[in-house]
Amino acid sequence: MNNILKRAYDALPAPLQSMILGGYSALLNRERYGGRFQEYCALMEKRQWLSRDDLISCQDEEVRRLVSHSYETVPYYRKLFDDRGLKPADIRGCGDLVKLPVLTREDIKKNFKALVSSAVASRSLRGGHTSGTTGSPLEVLYDPAAVTMTYAALDRQYKWAGCRLGRDGDRVVVARGNVIVPLAQARPPFWRTNRSLNQLLLSSFHMSSRNLAEYFRAIGDFAPAVLDGYPSTLYILAKYLRNQGIRFPLKAVISSSETLYDFQRSTIEESFQCKVFDYFALAERVVFATECDRHEGHHLCMEYGVTEILDENDDPLPDGRSGKLVGTSLANFGMPLIRYQTNDHTALRSGPCSCGRGLVMMDDVTTKAEDILTLKDGRVISPSVLTHPFKPLTSIEESQIVQEELDRIIVKIVPGHTFSEGDRKHLVKELRERLGDEVRIDIEIVESCPRLPSGKFKWVVSKVPLGV
């Protein structure tokens, strides 16, 4: 939304803002849930029960189609193949993708126009940007089919959670990063409605101990079945309920876009009396992974893309070994991304989920490159292991770890009323046990922890280059 439209929107009363949001959503829904949406949903419903080998065979066929299309219509890939003496016939399936180099963010920025297919009308392409959580935002383009398949994958996640998306589906409260309420607004309502999808949209930028009671009055009046949002925002809502001694039963909670830590999951499930279903997706639309009702990990949406795990030399790693997450989109033929190197690390599993689906299982993605601490002695510390000192401290409203130097971290604390000197000493002691005596640990009391412009929250922020 440009500045003029934003100012005009901000000047409108809340009911008119809701009407505009609903109308805009209805326009987007034609593409998201129109076209081949039902076809993709039926395909995903059928294929999820195939064996792993059969699913890979289906992917092999899609890879051949993608490679042929890319060679014939995308200048970047035509040159890449020719320079390497390759023909499309040399890539017979997923296993042959290793004959091609990984595609980096820098490659996309330098060759943006050359990566666009001449076979897809430019007016039909949609633009998107990564959030910039691991660097500067990256612009990518995708065709309508990629948009539709993304929402078919999301629809399957909702179905696995026992819920239904859409105007005639379950009522959903959404707590994400869109600035739907003017930031200068000091009084409720800090929410808007989207009737086209049966949603109540919450502002993530106005939540405070002073305002949360008003939020929950609105949520209660809306009577939702589902809560969908960023883990950090869901956790704020859940902690408020816990501190008030209240339970707010829902059918399911859907989380995505940030790492969901175990302490967040347990608090959210306790407060909302239901299971959390977490999914992983990227703006580049190369990977989509969802959680079923067994909660044994994330199922890769193998209809959506091919996923590889590589070591630091770009060599494939076996199942069970953690490495760089690399994805090839099987949905986006407008700007094909083949072997795109994400900034994420994870591992694939060799065994199936007990649910019986053949979709390959992926471990949680918890270690984005900038969020790993690198210490002076060369150790790298995953943020997940740093959550434990905070678990018993219900006196902390919010926290954030910032690494300024190899031997110094700052722990930002938004304290509750009962936060004490003993709690501070506990944190320093427990963190020092995990980081070592050579690391200086400073506790900084703050009113709020900063978020990214997208509204997302990074719990661990490292300003030190990754040491691996």
Residue ranges, per PLM feature:
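Generic structural signal for residues in well-ordered beta-strands
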Residues: Q199, V276, T307, S399, ...
